[in-house]
């Protein structure tokens, strides 16, 4: 009996020590809710993009300060006018199943992203490539006409429509991920929906997955740079309730979580509380398929009736900044010589309730209406979105005598409604993918996958194409400022603020980067101590 007890004690000690070891190698994050898809050619939300950033590596990767570092490509060069880029892949880059990652894998992934049958919302991110837009539209059927050429197993040559000096930043976007075609054809439509049907070209593999609860990632032992990755595991939990998330942090079930203004009061002098820029611009987006909201003066009236300076001071406790350009300010997006937003100036008009009343009256007259019909604004019910929505609701009631309903829902439900145009007004935000203002401004291009307003302006479309085809930064900035002025006049969105996130971070976590551009988190140098 004593021998049995001794064996049991030893086993228990071993289990406990293993648990402690595992915990010291595991970063635990809360991503609130499941993404719609983790297929890199289909992912279209922040959770999906974060998962893909763990299990997918593209040709280049993002540094802590938002620049491009070698990824699967160990080096690259371009011709004199930046229209032909050649990427040289490292020969020790492997898929998690041991297969080599080749230039053909990138070609296969990009062709799949552009295939009209794939119906990827971010296919337009590849339209820089020669004939990509025509192929996606079905006007060109032969994929060999695309500007994607496999020189050999480890050399990929890409021909662009126009000069693009920052294409090495563009290829960081997950839509540019490689595809292991043999594996993909084996698992079919189950691709990236379970650990068994997932494959990784990146730092981690999916170890386990409990739907709507958690995903555990384990270091990919076939990753070329595995020896320099300190975290063995990343556990991603889905806790959408703000109170439950804070409790999980207190109980050390997660290492970091966003907190609301109200929750931040509890942690007023707590060193675990930090403030980060997340790069997003927030606004009221208007569904212009709605007859009333198709009227520009109505949209202008609603926008001018909300005091965004007061929103920052009175509602958000000075976390964030009132927005006057759609392109987020202060996150490293440079114009000609300084921050693009500063060079553009205060483009969107300031709060003006008198002007708002005048515009409302004129808009109603044009529509032949006596008063504004009942409208509803939807918002995802996390963070500070509810109190922001209530502030907007009260502002419109006080300044315009307009009563709108507000309806909270999950992020995914809000996104689905916007994608299907099953909404009138939505409180929404947008983040850029790379350090250039066009990453924000191209979303108002007619039929862009993120153009949930269904806004269309021929001059704007012309400017987007011009900016994307120009290598002259002074001309590009001039044109992008004109684009800002066009949307400030047409107002497919009513600008509100540039968001900052108040977070709790466990001090055991070191070198985690909360990035305002591209990835939400950069974990390459993160460790637990």
Task: Label each region the model flagged.
Residues 102-109, 153-159, 202-203, 231-233, ...:
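Alpha-helical secondary-structure segments
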Residues 88, 107, 121-182:
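Surface-exposed binding/hinge segments that line
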Residues 154, 160-233, 241-243, 354:
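Gly/Pro-rich hinge or "lid" segments in bacterial periplasmic/extracellular proteins
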Residues 221-267:
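Ligand-site clamp/hinge motif
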Residues 211, 353, 357, 361-432, ...:
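Ligand/substrate-recognition segments at binding pockets and active sites
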Residues 30-80, 199-200:
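N-terminal lobe/hinge region of extracytoplasmic solute-binding protein
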Residues 322-363, 382-386:
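Structural transition elements
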Residues 305-336, 383-393, 417-529:
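Detector for C-terminal structural segments
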């Amino acid at each position: 009996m004593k021998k049995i007890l001794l064996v049991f004690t030893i086993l228990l000690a071993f289990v406990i020590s293993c648990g402690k070891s595992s915990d010291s190698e595991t970063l635990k994050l809360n991503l609130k809710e499941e993404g719609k898809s983790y297929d890199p050619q289909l992912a279209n939300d922040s959770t999906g993009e974060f998962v893909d950033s763990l299990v997918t590596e593209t040709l280049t990767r993002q540094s802590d300060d938002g620049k491009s570092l070698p990824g699967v490509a160990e080096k690259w060069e371009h011709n004199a006018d930046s229209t032909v880029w050649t990427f040289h892949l490292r020969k020790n880059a492997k898929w998690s199943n041991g297969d080599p990652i080749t230039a053909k894998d990138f070609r296969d992934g990009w062709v799949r992203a552009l295939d009209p049958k794939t119906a990827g919302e971010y296919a337009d991110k590849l339209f820089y490539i020669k004939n990509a837009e025509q192929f996606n539209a079905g006007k060109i059927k032969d994929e060999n006409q695309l500007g994607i050429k496999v020189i050999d197993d480890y050399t990929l040559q890409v021909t662009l429509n126009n000069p693009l000096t920052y294409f090495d930043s563009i290829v960081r976007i997950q839509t540019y991920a490689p595809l292991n075609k043999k594996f993909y054809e084996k698992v079919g439509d189950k691709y990236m929906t379970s650990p068994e049907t997932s494959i990784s070209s990146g730092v981690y593999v999916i170890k386990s997955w409990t739907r709507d609860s958690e995903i555990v990632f384990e270091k990919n032992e076939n990753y070329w740079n595995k020896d320099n990755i300190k975290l063995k595991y990343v556990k991603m939990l889905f806790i959408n309730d703000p109170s439950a998330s804070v409790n999980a942090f207190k109980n050390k079930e997660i290492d970091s979580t966003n907190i609301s203004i109200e929750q931040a009061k509890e942690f007023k002098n707590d060193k675990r509380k930090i403030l980060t820029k997340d790069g997003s611009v927030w606004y009221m987006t208007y569904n212009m398929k709605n007859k009333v909201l198709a009227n520009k003066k109505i949209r202008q009236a609603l926008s001018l009736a909300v005091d965004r300076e007061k929103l920052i001071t009175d509602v958000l406790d000075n976390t964030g900044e009132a927005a006057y350009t759609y392109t987020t300010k202060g996150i490293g997006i440079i114009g000609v010589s300084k921050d693009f937003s500063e060079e553009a100036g205060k483009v969107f008009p300031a709060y003006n309730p008198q002007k708002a009343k005048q515009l409302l009256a004129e808009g109603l007259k044009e529509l032949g209406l006596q008063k504004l019909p009942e409208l509803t604004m939807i918002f995802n019910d996390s963070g500070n979105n509810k109190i922001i929505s209530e502030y907007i609701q009260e502002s419109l009631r006080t300044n315009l005598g307009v009563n709108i309903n507000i309806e909270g829902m999950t992020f995914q439900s809000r996104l689905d409604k916007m994608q299907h145009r099953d909404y009138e007004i939505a409180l929404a935000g947008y983040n850029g993918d790379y350090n250039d203002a066009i990453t924000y401004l191209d979303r108002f291009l007619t039929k862009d996958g993120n153009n949930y307003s269904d806004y269309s302006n021929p001059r704007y479309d012309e400017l987007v194409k011009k900016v994307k085809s120009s290598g002259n930064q002074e001309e590009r900035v001039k044109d992008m400022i004109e684009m800002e002025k066009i949307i400030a006049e047409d107002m497919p969105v009513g600008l509100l603020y540039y968001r900052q996130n108040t977070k709790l971070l466990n001090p055991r976590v070191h070198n985690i980067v909360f990035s305002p551009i591209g990835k939400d988190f950069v974990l390459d140098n993160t460790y637990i101590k």
